[in-house]
Protein backbone atom coordinates (compact mmCIF):
# COMPACT_ATOMS: atom_id res chain seq x y z
CA UNK A 1 0.00 0.00 0.00
CA UNK A 2 2.84 2.35 0.89
CA UNK A 3 4.56 1.65 -2.42
CA UNK A 4 1.38 2.35 -4.38
CA UNK A 5 0.89 5.61 -2.49
CA UNK A 6 4.41 6.68 -3.40
CA UNK A 7 3.82 5.94 -7.08
CA UNK A 8 0.76 8.20 -6.97
CA UNK A 9 2.81 10.84 -5.16
CA UNK A 10 5.56 10.58 -7.79
CA UNK A 11 2.96 11.11 -10.51
CA UNK A 12 1.59 14.20 -8.74
CA UNK A 13 5.10 15.62 -8.25
CA UNK A 14 5.82 15.02 -11.93
CA UNK A 15 2.56 16.74 -12.83
CA UNK A 16 3.47 20.10 -11.28
CA UNK A 17 3.79 22.47 -14.29
CA UNK A 18 6.72 24.56 -13.09
CA UNK A 19 7.16 26.13 -16.52
CA UNK A 20 3.61 27.47 -16.45
CA UNK A 21 3.94 28.69 -12.85
CA UNK A 22 7.26 30.43 -13.52
CA UNK A 23 6.16 32.04 -16.80
CA UNK A 24 2.90 33.31 -15.35
CA UNK A 25 4.45 34.52 -12.10
CA UNK A 26 7.50 36.30 -13.47
CA UNK A 27 6.59 37.12 -17.08
CA UNK A 28 2.79 37.25 -17.08
CA UNK A 29 2.68 34.93 -20.10
CA UNK A 30 1.17 31.51 -20.69
CA UNK A 31 3.70 29.25 -22.46
CA UNK A 32 0.80 27.14 -23.71
CA UNK A 33 -0.26 29.97 -26.01
CA UNK A 34 3.11 31.37 -27.11
CA UNK A 35 6.24 30.14 -28.84
CA UNK A 36 6.09 26.37 -29.28
CA UNK A 37 3.08 26.24 -26.90
CA UNK A 38 4.97 23.94 -24.57
CA UNK A 39 5.46 24.33 -20.81
CA UNK A 40 9.06 23.10 -20.90
CA UNK A 41 12.28 24.98 -20.25
CA UNK A 42 13.08 25.71 -23.90
CA UNK A 43 9.82 27.54 -24.54
CA UNK A 44 9.97 29.38 -21.21
CA UNK A 45 13.47 30.55 -22.17
CA UNK A 46 12.14 31.77 -25.53
CA UNK A 47 9.29 33.69 -23.94
CA UNK A 48 10.83 34.90 -20.66
CA UNK A 49 14.59 34.78 -21.08
CA UNK A 50 17.37 32.30 -20.44
CA UNK A 51 17.35 32.73 -16.67
CA UNK A 52 13.74 31.67 -16.29
CA UNK A 53 14.34 28.86 -18.75
CA UNK A 54 17.19 27.58 -16.58
CA UNK A 55 15.00 27.87 -13.49
CA UNK A 56 12.31 25.81 -15.22
CA UNK A 57 14.92 23.25 -16.26
CA UNK A 58 16.18 22.87 -12.69
CA UNK A 59 12.65 22.47 -11.32
CA UNK A 60 11.73 19.91 -13.98
CA UNK A 61 14.92 17.95 -13.29
CA UNK A 62 14.09 17.93 -9.58
CA UNK A 63 10.67 16.47 -10.40
CA UNK A 64 12.58 13.38 -11.45
CA UNK A 65 15.32 13.39 -8.84
CA UNK A 66 13.15 13.76 -5.74
CA UNK A 67 10.67 10.89 -6.24
CA UNK A 68 13.40 8.39 -7.15
CA UNK A 69 15.81 9.54 -4.44
CA UNK A 70 13.10 9.28 -1.78
CA UNK A 71 12.06 5.84 -3.06
CA UNK A 72 15.66 4.71 -2.61
CA UNK A 73 15.49 5.57 1.10
CA UNK A 74 12.78 3.01 1.89
CA UNK A 75 13.17 0.36 -0.81
CA UNK A 76 15.95 -1.60 -2.47
CA UNK A 77 13.88 -2.73 -5.45
CA UNK A 78 15.15 -1.64 -8.87
CA UNK A 79 11.71 -2.46 -10.27
CA UNK A 80 10.11 -0.06 -7.81
CA UNK A 81 12.66 2.63 -8.65
CA UNK A 82 11.86 2.18 -12.34
CA UNK A 83 8.12 2.39 -11.69
CA UNK A 84 8.65 5.53 -9.59
CA UNK A 85 10.66 7.07 -12.42
CA UNK A 86 7.94 6.24 -14.93
CA UNK A 87 5.26 7.68 -12.65
CA UNK A 88 7.13 10.99 -12.45
CA UNK A 89 7.69 11.03 -16.21
CA UNK A 90 4.06 10.26 -16.96
CA UNK A 91 3.08 13.07 -14.61
CA UNK A 92 5.21 15.47 -16.62
CA UNK A 93 3.87 14.19 -19.94
CA UNK A 94 0.22 13.94 -18.85
CA UNK A 95 -0.19 16.39 -16.01
CA UNK A 96 -3.34 16.13 -13.92
CA UNK A 97 -3.11 19.92 -13.52
CA UNK A 98 -3.10 20.56 -17.29
CA UNK A 99 -5.93 18.34 -18.44
CA UNK A 100 -3.53 15.42 -18.92
CA UNK A 101 -1.29 17.36 -21.24
CA UNK A 102 2.23 18.44 -20.43
CA UNK A 103 5.83 18.78 -21.49
CA UNK A 104 8.17 16.48 -23.37
CA UNK A 105 9.83 14.85 -20.35
CA UNK A 106 13.47 15.43 -21.30
CA UNK A 107 14.42 17.40 -18.18
CA UNK A 108 12.56 14.96 -15.96
CA UNK A 109 14.37 12.10 -17.72
CA UNK A 110 17.63 13.71 -16.64
CA UNK A 111 16.26 13.87 -13.12
CA UNK A 112 15.18 10.26 -12.75
CA UNK A 113 18.49 8.91 -14.04
CA UNK A 114 20.71 11.11 -11.85
CA UNK A 115 20.30 8.80 -8.83
CA UNK A 116 19.91 5.62 -10.91
CA UNK A 117 22.72 5.74 -13.48
CA UNK A 118 24.72 8.94 -13.24
CA UNK A 119 27.72 8.07 -15.42
CA UNK A 120 25.74 6.76 -18.43
CA UNK A 121 23.46 9.78 -18.08
CA UNK A 122 26.41 12.18 -17.99
CA UNK A 123 27.89 10.78 -21.21
CA UNK A 124 24.48 10.89 -22.90
CA UNK A 125 23.90 14.46 -21.71
CA UNK A 126 27.28 15.54 -23.09
CA UNK A 127 26.36 14.04 -26.47
CA UNK A 128 23.03 15.88 -26.27
CA UNK A 129 24.79 19.18 -25.54
CA UNK A 130 27.21 18.60 -28.42
CA UNK A 131 24.37 17.97 -30.88
CA UNK A 132 22.51 21.09 -29.72
CA UNK A 133 25.69 23.16 -29.98
CA UNK A 134 26.51 21.90 -33.46
CA UNK A 135 22.99 21.89 -34.92
CA UNK A 136 21.05 24.41 -32.85
CA UNK A 137 18.16 21.94 -32.57
CA UNK A 138 17.16 21.27 -28.97
CA UNK A 139 14.76 18.58 -30.15
CA UNK A 140 17.54 16.71 -31.98
CA UNK A 141 19.73 16.90 -28.91
CA UNK A 142 16.91 15.55 -26.76
CA UNK A 143 16.39 12.61 -29.09
CA UNK A 144 20.14 11.97 -29.05
CA UNK A 145 20.06 11.90 -25.25
CA UNK A 146 17.38 9.23 -24.94
CA UNK A 147 18.86 7.18 -27.79
CA UNK A 148 22.34 7.23 -26.29
CA UNK A 149 21.20 6.42 -22.76
CA UNK A 150 20.30 2.73 -23.21
CA UNK A 151 23.48 2.26 -25.25
CA UNK A 152 25.58 3.82 -22.48
CA UNK A 153 23.85 1.60 -19.91
CA UNK A 154 24.74 -1.41 -22.04
CA UNK A 155 28.35 -0.33 -22.53
CA UNK A 156 28.87 0.33 -18.80
CA UNK A 157 27.23 -2.94 -17.80
CA UNK A 158 24.30 -1.30 -16.01
CA UNK A 159 21.74 -3.72 -17.42
CA UNK A 160 19.18 -3.16 -14.65
CA UNK A 161 17.80 0.08 -16.03
CA UNK A 162 17.99 -0.66 -19.76
CA UNK A 163 14.26 -1.59 -19.88
CA UNK A 164 13.42 1.72 -18.20
CA UNK A 165 15.64 3.61 -20.63
CA UNK A 166 13.97 1.94 -23.62
CA UNK A 167 10.50 2.84 -22.33
CA UNK A 168 11.66 6.40 -21.69
CA UNK A 169 13.14 6.59 -25.20
CA UNK A 170 9.78 5.52 -26.64
CA UNK A 171 7.88 8.09 -24.57
CA UNK A 172 10.23 10.93 -25.49
CA UNK A 173 10.21 10.05 -29.19
CA UNK A 174 6.40 10.04 -29.05
CA UNK A 175 6.32 13.41 -27.30
CA UNK A 176 8.63 14.76 -30.02
CA UNK A 177 6.67 13.33 -32.95
CA UNK A 178 5.79 16.80 -34.27
CA UNK A 179 9.42 17.92 -33.93
CA UNK A 180 10.55 14.81 -35.81
CA UNK A 181 8.15 15.66 -38.62
CA UNK A 182 9.45 19.23 -38.79
CA UNK A 183 13.06 18.01 -38.75
CA UNK A 184 12.28 15.64 -41.63
CA UNK A 185 10.68 18.48 -43.61
CA UNK A 186 13.42 20.97 -42.76
CA UNK A 187 10.95 23.16 -40.88
CA UNK A 188 12.23 22.84 -37.30
CA UNK A 189 13.45 26.15 -35.86
CA UNK A 190 17.08 26.03 -34.66
CA UNK A 191 17.33 27.46 -31.17
CA UNK A 192 20.67 29.22 -31.67
CA UNK A 193 19.77 30.77 -35.02
CA UNK A 194 16.47 31.96 -33.62
CA UNK A 195 18.23 33.65 -30.73
CA UNK A 196 20.74 35.26 -33.08
CA UNK A 197 17.96 36.69 -35.24
CA UNK A 198 16.23 38.13 -32.21
CA UNK A 199 19.36 40.12 -31.35
CA UNK A 200 20.03 41.41 -34.86
Curated annotation (Swiss-Prot):
What the entry lists under InterPro entries is as follows: G3P_acylTferase_PlsY
Function noted in UniProt:
Catalyzes the transfer of an acyl group from acyl-phosphate (acyl-PO(4)) to glycerol-3-phosphate (G3P) to form lysophosphatidic acid (LPA). This enzyme utilizes acyl-phosphate as fatty acyl donor, but not acyl-CoA or acyl-ACP.
Spans traversing the lipid bilayer: 3-23, 52-72, 78-98, 112-132, 153-173
E.C. code: 2.3.1.275
- Write down the Pfam families for this protein, in alphabetical order: G3P_acyltransf
User: In its UniProt entry, what is this protein called?
Assistant: Glycerol-3-phosphate acyltransferase
Assembly and partners are described as:
Probably interacts with PlsX.
Gene coding for it: plsY
Give the highest taxon in the source lineage: Bacteria
Please verify whether the record's keywords include Metal-binding.
Answer: no
This enzyme catalyses: an acyl phosphate + sn-glycerol 3-phosphate = a 1-acyl-sn-glycero-3-phosphate + phosphate
Q: Which family does it belong to?
A: Belongs to the PlsY family.
Might you report a single GO cellular component term? plasma membrane
Please state the protein's primary subcellular location.
membrane
Amino acid sequence: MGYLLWLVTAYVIGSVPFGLVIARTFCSVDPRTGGSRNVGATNVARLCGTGFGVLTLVCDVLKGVVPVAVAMTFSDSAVFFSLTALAALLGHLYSVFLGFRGGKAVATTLGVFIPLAFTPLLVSALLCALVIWRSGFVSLGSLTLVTALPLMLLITGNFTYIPLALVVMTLVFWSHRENIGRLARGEEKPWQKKKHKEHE
